[in-house]
């Protein structure tokens, strides 16, 4: 199993019920300033998140790992449905802790949004997010 890309793939479909299958029943989440414990709360958190974040394009890179823990760096772009559909990019880090069965038991995300001007988008239609050169300034 590719633990870095599997969550990316399930998120791309934006189906909270499918996403939570990768998490333990009592998984603990922090997503920015929101906290969730267990599948029902995670589904609620994801539903609200994706009501806000439209046309979501995500890229994650392995940052480091040790035993049952992984950290990833990510960038994603979206249109903010709660802010006039402005394009934004989120820069952030996540740390994940896995159970012995391979499901994630803890996920913590810290991210910062930057409003994008015309022409600033990286993850445009017709181009894979993996093709985008992300310069040192953004690493």
Model-derived regions: residue spans:
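Eukaryote-specific detector of the first structured module of a protein
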Residues: 1, 11-14
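Amphipathic alpha-helical repeat scaffolds
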Residues: 5-9
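Short, well-ordered alpha-helical segments enriched in acidic and aromatic residues
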Residues: 13-26, 30
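A beta-strand edge to alpha-helix "cap/lid" segment located at domain peripheries
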Residues: 44-139
């Amino acid at each position: 199993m590719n633990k870095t890309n599997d969550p990316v793939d399930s998120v791309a479909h934006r189906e909270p019920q499918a996403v939570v299958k990768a998490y333990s029943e009592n998984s603990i989440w922090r997503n920015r300033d929101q906290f969730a414990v267990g599948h029902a709360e995670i589904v609620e958190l994801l539903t609200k998140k994706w009501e806000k974040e439209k046309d979501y394009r995500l890229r994650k890179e392995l940052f480091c790992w040790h035993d049952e823990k992984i950290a990833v760096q990510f960038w994603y772009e979206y249109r903010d449905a709660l802010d006039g559909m402005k394009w934004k990019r989120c820069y952030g880090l996540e740390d994940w802790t896995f159970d012995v069965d391979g499901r994630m038991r803890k996920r913590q995300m810290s991210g910062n949004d930057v409003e994008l001007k015309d022409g600033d988008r990286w993850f445009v239609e017709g181009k894979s997010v993996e093709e985008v050169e992300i310069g040192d300034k953004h690493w």
